[in-house]
Amino acid sequence: RRRQRQMCIRDSNSIGQVLLARRMGKRRIIAETGAGQHGVATATVCALMNMECIVYMGKTDVERQRVNVEKMKMLGATVVPVTSGNMTLKDATNEAIRDWCCHPSDTYYVIGSTVGPHPYPDMVARLQSVISEEIRKQLLEHEGRECPDYLIACVGGGSNAAGTIYHYVNDPHVQIVLAEAGGKGIETGMTAATIALGKMGIIHGSRTYVIQNEDGQIEEPYSISAGLDYPGIGPMHANLAKQKRAIVLAVNDDEAIRAAYELTRLEGIIPALESAHALGALEKMKFKPTDVVVLTVSGRGDKDIETYLSDE
């Protein structure tokens, strides 16, 4: 039967992990979410499989992503607002991990990005690799080749970027461009530009770049985008940046908003704020007329309409 899809790129990750949880005999599913997309995807799968679903979400994000919160509730999930710290994605992840540690026998934690302890970063990247599989198929159909010249994706934790580049990482002819959240500007302190400002550290079980102070304490990140508002980065992306395999650009809030409006007016596509950062990277790049450029628009902008209108 055809079912209306509640989500897009997040589905494959949630489906894979919930199926794994069921195989392991777990009855209770927990997840964290920032923009709410991963929460909706996980709640959808749990509804289909008749499994309990608890989603942790920072109180700040609950308020700015009300549409997705209501979707999760309609799907039968319990949404737990997190009031610690900056009340955003990092804090939601903290609470989800605490829950997981307290209920190891019956609970499975569906992590939404390429973060957390092994094997989560690798597992999420593999499940999201359907994105690059689809890119290869569409390029072959429309361009007569499987490889683009450039791949562009936004990065917070990095799940959609990992899926976008998965089958191209070892191809030196494909230039990878990662757009992270510059916030109000990387020099202002109100930013989530982890690769630009971060130092090597540990966050949620991963060794990666982390925004931290001189004492090693994790700093509170900021981004207009709830899904990119994270002080770490997936270890895969940290390594790509360290090895100079990827170009990393910090895209500020206003640049992302401007790029989102441009896409909407030119193509009739309203992108999520997360994807708008990838679009904002376009004006920072120079391409040849013959270059084939693939940019992943990883989510719809329905959830961000109020933010777009208030920042127009």
Short names for language-model regions:
Residues 137-146:
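Phosphate/pyrophosphate-binding loops at sites that engage ATP/ADP/AMP, CoA/4′-phosphopantetheine
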Residues 93-123, 145, 170-173, 178-269, ...:
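Active-site/ligand-binding loops adjacent to catalytic centers
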Residues 11-15, 31-49, 63-66, 154-165, ...:
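Short glycine/serine/threonine-rich phosphate/pyrophosphate-binding segments
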Residues 155-159, 163, 253-312:
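Claisen-condensing/thiolase-fold acyl-transfer catalytic domains that form or cleave C-C bonds
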Residues 2-9:
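Short, small-residue-biased leader/transition segments that mark boundaries at the very start
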Residues 27, 46, 51-53, 171-194, ...:
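Residues forming the flavin
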Residues 21-58, 146-160, 176-179, 292-297:
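A short, small-residue-rich loop immediately preceding and capping a beta-strand
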Residues 19, 30, 38-96, 187-198, ...:
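Active-site-proximal loop->helix
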